[in-house]
């Protein structure tokens, strides 16, 4: 498979290059950057030296890029992919968008939260949370890769919603992200002196991943679900940790909870069910496509607390994109993604 990456110099883009380089059936075709056109990617990211010796191109010759590619990954901020997708409508080239442009069934929700007019509302995109929508991804031409917070948060509670074990009201998600989640562009809040030895909430009651999580929760619950979602910035490079709180329905047992998780995830290669009373740790998923999930019930409040963590650049972005590519092309779903986490 010939794979091209549009927006190859951002954190998600360069992570795609790392994973594609180690993929047994993928060949990197074209890599682009509008701000660094003509430069060698290895000069910007020396860890790629000797492995990926390609120069960055402009994406202006989009039709030519598509002709040279079996699949195009778009790793650009929101607002760009919809233009690319619209231009390539009818092309044989498959598209996987790592941004937010195609994640919503109702494009008006996108416009409300992203404050951008959607330019490709007629697109037929599949939401690419692979473990939940594998069959749809398999036949897709355009896949919307989920967000990092959303992947972690959705996987945490969907089994409990599907099997009607928790109330749909009062769900609270307290999530934390490493600084790479904010992207590579220069921001005062992402500077070393701002992040180091500090911890803060941001996007309170306004984060764009909120409606994305609600959309999938509602689909599995069979009714509208509204959540309280608060993200925080951790002084670490990588990782997403979501602590999710929900009220258990009357009479629900620990055995039913475990059965629900096993029913949905027991055979999933990348989801590691740690079980009751186990608190997952970011260090155990770093650099990998794994999802580590643990939970505990609180008899005092009648709530369940689900703790879930992923690497935001792998399962939360590039890794899941490669996983979707594998499914789209009918090859081993774990191809190129079997790396163990980096410990220490």
Model-flagged regions — what are they?
Residues 1-197, 202-204, 296-300, 343-344:
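N-terminal Rossmann-like NAD(P) cofactor-binding subdomain of oxidoreductases
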Residues 11, 79, 124, 151-155, ...:
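Conserved active-site and cofactor/substrate-binding residues in soluble primary-metabolism enzymes
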Residues 17, 154-161, 210-214, 258, ...:
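Predominant activation on well-ordered alpha-helical scaffold segments within soluble catalytic domains
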Residues 22, 219, 327-331:
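Short, well-ordered loop/turn and helix-capping segments at boundaries between secondary-structure elements
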Residues 27-63, 169-170, 174-175, 179-306:
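C-terminal substrate-binding/catalytic lobe of Rossmann-fold NAD(P)-dependent oxidoreductases
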Residues 149, 249, 313:
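Glycine-/small-residue-rich active-site loops that bind phosphorylated ligands and cofactors
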Residues 263-265, 282-344:
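C-terminal helical cap and adjacent loop that interface with cofactors, partners, or active-site loops
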